[in-house]
């Protein structure tokens, strides 16, 4: 198996706003995946998970911290980013960041 040389992950945990359906949220997620992020330098991918309590977790994978930090201000100016953000309960949101360590 090929070893990844560098990776930085961003974990975002959150709940949806009251009244937002799973279908609305997944449609917004699909728009993110098919949008500008595909061309963003250092972007490796993103995965989405849902817990049994209804909360969500998105794991974004980047080449490094700088690539992740460059995306954040861009994301919030995009139409799809604003639509996505409008569905989240930001009071429930938590972010964590990790850098891959290869022993």
Task: Give the positions of each predicted feature.
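Short, surface-exposed ligand-recognition loops at beta-strand->loop->(often short) alpha-helix junctions
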Residues: 15-28
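Glycine-rich beta-strand-turn "strand-cap" elements at beta-sheet edges
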Residues: 1-8, 14-17, 47-57, 80-103
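An amphipathic, aromatic/His-enriched active-site/gating alpha helix that lines ligand/cofactor pockets
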Residues: 31, 35-44, 61-96
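Short coil/turn motifs at secondary-structure junctions
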Residues: 17-19, 51, 63-67
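Intrinsically disordered, low-complexity acidic/polar segments
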Residues: 21-23, 55, 67-69
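Helix-centric, low-specificity signal for extended rod-like, repetitive segments
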Residues: 6, 26, 39-40
């Amino acid at each position: 198996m090929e070893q990844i040389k560098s990776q930085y992950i961003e974990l975002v945990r959150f709940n949806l706003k009251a009244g937002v359906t799973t279908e609305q949220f997944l449609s917004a997620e699909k728009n993110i995946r098919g949008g500008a992020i595909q061309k963003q330098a250092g972007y490796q991918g993103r995965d989405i998970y849902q817990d049994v309590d209804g909360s969500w977790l998105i794991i974004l994978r980047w080449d490094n911290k700088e690539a992740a930090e460059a995306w954040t201000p861009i994301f919030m100016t995009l139409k799809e980013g604003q639509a996505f953000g409008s569905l989240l309960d930001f009071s429930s949101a938590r972010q964590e960041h990790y850098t891959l360590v290869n022993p």
